[in-house]
């Protein structure tokens, strides 16, 4: 085990470029062309959303910690970067990922309890027992080459909270963005600290002006906030390249809370320049998150579920 992300197996073996991921997935589809033709599936993002929802449902029944849930989601991404989805029962893979992640994160769950809860959730979709879960665990560990330690972005949020003067609402919103990023390719593309920086930036620009329990950001305000985030990053990137400080925005908002928010975003941009964070990576990751939120608006749970269940039953993977 490495205590340093840069020397970890996650950094050395499980960090890819977008082009590498595309190539890996294309090869899987080419190697399983007949299955792909017979059982069309929604685009990858929609599958991620569905798997995320199912994983959360099972995890809540087991009262599993967020860290273990996050690791389980990374395991699924790694596993399905090596194995064609249509050759597996995703429900068994979800249960296995949770079981394995809990052991690695030192909060183990009894295998019989996970089997029982999985049966109750997906009874007619997976004939799961302890031996099948154990076999799937061995399969998953083998495909991941026993490289099971996962560094998560949550730690960075905690470490920087005081330095960046983040309030409770901003920390909570940043953690929510991190939770959402597991439904994208970002865990396989960028280091955890980059994801954390993006989450903090989005928390600063998306937090409602009148923050209070149960209040949310309107669609128009969210769109404006995301645009502001991209603008701040581009400005910081330009200044970082020049070795200078980010310039303040030309126009000052009249509304005080909005002015305070812009000021905090500018201070964060200055902090990014001073800290030599890879702002280009942040720009790409921010765009990926924004693109995901746009995709989520059009997500069809019923269609996704039906297409997954169709190949599970047609191939006898529920037996």
UniProtKB/Swiss-Prot annotation:
* SMART domains the record matches: CYCLIN
Which InterPro entries does the annotation name? Cyclin-like_dom, Cyclin-like_sf, Cyclin/Ssn8, Cyclin_N
> Do the record's keywords include Calcium?
no
Locations of Low complexity compositional bias?
Answer: 237-251
What Pfam families would the database entry show?
Cyclin_N
User: What is a GO molecular function of this protein?
Assistant: cyclin-dependent protein serine/threonine kinase regulator activity
Q: Name one GO cellular component term.
A: nucleus
Q: Where in the cell is it found?
A: Nucleus
Which keywords belong to this entry?
Activator, Cyclin, Nucleus, Repressor, Transcription, Transcription regulation
What are the recorded Gene Ontology BP terms?
regulation of transcription by RNA polymerase II
Q: Point to the regions of Basic and acidic residues compositional bias.
A: 252-261
Superkingdom classification of source: Eukaryota
UniProt-annotated stretches for the region Disordered: 237-261
Residue span, Cyclin N-terminal domain: 53-142
* Alphabetized PANTHER family for the sequence: CYCLIN
Cited function: Component of the SRB8-11 complex. The SRB8-11 complex is a regulatory module of the Mediator complex which is itself involved in regulation of basal and activated RNA polymerase II-dependent transcription. The SRB8-11 complex may be involved in the transcriptional repression of a subset of genes regulated by Mediator. It may inhibit the association of the Mediator complex with RNA polymerase II to form the holoenzyme complex. The SRB8-11 complex phosphorylates the C-terminal domain (CTD) of the largest subunit of RNA polymerase II.
Q: Into which family does the record put it?
A: Belongs to the cyclin family. Cyclin C subfamily.
**Quaternary organization:** Component of the SRB8-11 complex, a regulatory module of the Mediator complex. Interacts with SSN3/FCK1.
Q: What is this protein called?
A: RNA polymerase II holoenzyme cyclin-like subunit
**In which organism is this protein found?**
Gibberella moniliformis
